[in-house]
Amino acid sequence: MKDRKLLNIELGRISADEYRNSRPESGVVLVLDNIRSAHNVGSAFRTADAFGVDKVYLGGICPVPPSPELRKVALGAEEVVPFEHVSDVVSLVKRLQADGYKVIAVEQTVHSVKLDAFRREPSARYALVFGNEVEGVQQAVVDACDCALEIPQQGTKHSLNVSVSIGVTLWGIR
């Protein structure tokens, strides 16, 4: 059987305004801890849109919309997904915990849970923290989080681009 790609009209896309006004809460927010690349932040927005993430927190040196480089990758997702810039990620973690979120550092730690072993609690709200391209999640932020989640990997690098990690993690916890 020959297959074909769907046409845009068949995808049932709605306008950004319609989506903003009707989107259900997913119970998941992203926290970007000092991610320096506008391309990675733009990709995070686009992936957050695809998975229905409630909000993206941009910590420290993260590029913040409006940014032409960020927009080039986000393709307008930064206009649909709510965001907030914060200077202190540790304070944000504590605020999110006080608001009832389970805050999870996506990082390789001594006690990290493998993504394939993670079981999402149906009514729980999660804040997923992703770190800088070189240093990862700051140790002080890891210390403040409730736990850590690790993407099992093979090979020699034992790391993924942060934008890839975001997509893998959001798919894994769905």
Can you say where each PLM-predicted feature lies in the sequence?
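Post-transcriptional modification and biogenesis factors for structured RNAs
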Residues: 1-174
